[in-house]
Regions:
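Bacterial N-terminal signal peptides
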Residues: 8-18
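Sec/Tat signal peptide C-region and signal peptidase I cleavage site
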Residues: 20-24
Length: 188
């Protein structure tokens, strides 16, 4: 009886660890929405935006890489909302995105990627789903987030080996090409 309990506990812990590793995606993104410049609006849409963007970045499987939780790429998406229209759900924002990685054989991190995007503009409805389909780029917010996710991953891989992120950076370039059809000036 005791052996059976030990065996059950052992198998359960193995399954839990396997599930945790299999679920781990490439990014560990922290998303912050700064809406100080926007007044007279309900905060629900901003909270929903922050939650959905965080889930989208962290839960999406961007590549075929298999990473453990501690190997995820640390990144920050700081979105400053300059204007918001609740009539057409449009956001005019500035994005500051950064990623960092551990310095080899050290205990500290260094910045691998940093970019300020003054034209981070999109439409977002509070209950809409963010879904990435590489073969059909039809949502501005999803395209922007996917572009930056691929940039972060590609550059991170480049820091580990020369041209190591080329394939992933090519995916970012494909999004730029597809983004031309979205009628937002930032892609041109």
């Amino acid at each position: 009886m005791r052996k059976r309990k030990l065996l059950t506990a052992f198998i359960s812990s193995l399954l839990l660890m396997t599930h945790q590793t299999a679920r781990a995606q490439e990014l560990e993104a922290k998303v912050t929405i700064n809406r100080a410049q926007v007044s007279d609006t309900k905060g629900d849409v901003f909270e929903s935006l922050e939650k959905k963007v965080t889930e989208f970045l962290n839960d999406q499987k961007w590549t075929e890489l298999k990473l453990r939780d501690k190997e995820k790429i640390q990144c920050n998406f700081n979105i400053t909302v300059n204007t918001y229209s609740d009539t057409d759900n449009s956001f005019t924002c500035t994005l500051l995105v950064t990623s960092s990685r551990p310095v080899y054989d050290a205990t500290y991190m260094t910045t691998a990627f940093s970019n300020r995007d003054p034209q981070f503009n999109f439409k977002f409805q509070e209950h809409a789903r963010l879904e990435f389909r590489p073969e059909q780029i039809d949502n501005q917010l999803v395209a922007l987030l996917a572009y930056y996710a691929y940039m972060i991953i590609g550059i991170d891989l480049d820091t580990m080996s020369p041209m190591g992120g080329t394939d992933i950076l090519n995916r970012a370039e494909e999004i730029v090409t597809a983004g031309q059809t979205l009628d937002y000036p930032g892609w041109k």
